[in-house]
Amino acid sequence: MNKRDVYLNASEVLSAPLSNKTSSVVSTIEDESVAFKSFREEINCSDFTSILSYFDAVLYPLFKKLNLSASDLAKTNLFLGSTSLDISAVKVGDEDKLWLSKTDKISQALAKRYGLNELEFTFSTACTASANACLYASRLISTGKIEHALVIGCEFYNPLTVEGFKSLDLISKTELIAFAKGRSGLILGEGVAALYLSSTPTAQCSLKMLGGASSCDTYSLTMTQEDGSHIAQVINDCLLQANIQSTDIDLIKVHGTATLGNDEAECNALTTLFNTSEITQSPPPIIAFKPFTGHTLGACGVIEIALFADCLSKESYIPPEYITQNNDLMWPFYKGNDFSQVNTVLFNYFGFGGNNAALVFQCYRGTE
């Protein structure tokens, strides 16, 4: 069976530091780092109806950008990825309702609200949720089972998430500085983003998806193996599925949470995969978004792809300038960065509980 290509025809993102601007991630660089990058002063997340207004701010501009008709939307399947879903709308004191809330509540509401195809999917695999949503959507498009996919990542503030990460001593009291020797943990963030995937490129197309892989590491209930072996295997599987070699990678979008174990595992995997001690050419450079957006957990897959697509359209790249010393973990991947010839990009996502995913995209410039 001949598989169809999968293209990212448009994307839109609303990340808390953007202050309701759905354009460029460059805006986030100007914001000072805060303990929690939050929407809470703008929209009340404790009300489900208010939560839906986030999606309006992202999806209506996306639909307009692609000039999608009601008929187009009816042929579009929804793939939603999130860690906490609508837990923020469960009122304090209603703990029993927390466990009765349906996991597809948001996806059903969105499908009805925008007239999408009635077949919708929800993914909640920790920090890989929306990355897995993107992976599965692309597979259904490539095999001809669906025509179009609207892939959404969303994450909203809720006390359960904050207290959970605090109890594990994973939250930084200062800032998120991934891979730095002095890193002290993550900063949580909120955001909503959407990708529109199809088998045919449009004038707005920015990326072509080459492949991806996802797998669960049984090493621990909370984290992946720190030697990076499972992460390296997932990336290898991703490259195999995309039919490319590690030497074809021009840029790596790192997961980069700034937690001690996660950064170490990712660094070990990439160092092994790109064999930095033996290769004669410099390994591919890295790019990280969490220092600017915070860690948006299950939404980070789609948010970071959308932000990269935005950077690509503006020819703006964000070097990890916080990696300044040769004893920082990813130093070999920082030296000699050159973003001018980026073509093939590896996106890494590694989740709580050991669910790991990797995706490969090719920059699309109107020709194959």
Task: Name each model-derived stretch.
Residues 1-118, 158, 167, 171-187, ...:
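Conserved "HGTGT" condensation-loop signature of ketosynthase/thiolase-family condensing enzymes
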Residues 126:
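Amphipathic alpha-helical interface segments
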Residues 130:
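Short conserved active-site loop signatures built around small residues
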Residues 134, 138:
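Short, conserved alpha-helix that lines the donor NDP-sugar binding/gating region
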Residues 140-141, 312:
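Hydrophobic pocket-lining residues that define ligand/cofactor binding sites across diverse proteins
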Residues 145-147, 342:
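Short, high-confidence coil segments that cap the C-terminus of an alpha-helix
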